[in-house]
Amino acid sequence: MKPVDQTPTEAADYAALSALYGSLLAGLAYAARDREPIPNGELLPLSAATFALSKLIVHEKVETWLRQPFVEESADGRRPRGRRLRYAVGELLGCTRCVGAWSALALVALRLHSPTVGRTATTVLAASAANDAFQSAFSLLCERANAAKEAAAQPRDLAAARQAA
């Protein structure tokens, strides 16, 4: 991200986003005070769900509708639209880590407000994160297998070239 003085924003725009996040977090903490705490065993699934949700929002085509008012997408990449708060939100929507913080807040709020719905959403998103991990591992495995196959074929190709010469 560029420094504030190199963007069409002001520090107040980022302060507004921080104040909103802080207010939502404080409201969540206040609402949670009389509720049963989320069990420690749910931290890993919530983390995986947060990863999947933030990746979905920031990177996937299916969520273009959500980014479109704030982010200009082209073949050259993405850049925030507009100026001031709109631009700042566009920057946020281009940052997986930033969206992850908001996603975590939303998922924990959902889990505290409606435990069954929250656990269901967390399970679906955590399974999606596991799928991403498996897909990445499979792609890496295929890439390495193909590289090994090519490396093994090179000496034979060299030997065949020598025999032909």
Segments and roles (model prediction):
Residues 1-165:
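Short amphipathic, positively biased membrane-proximal segments
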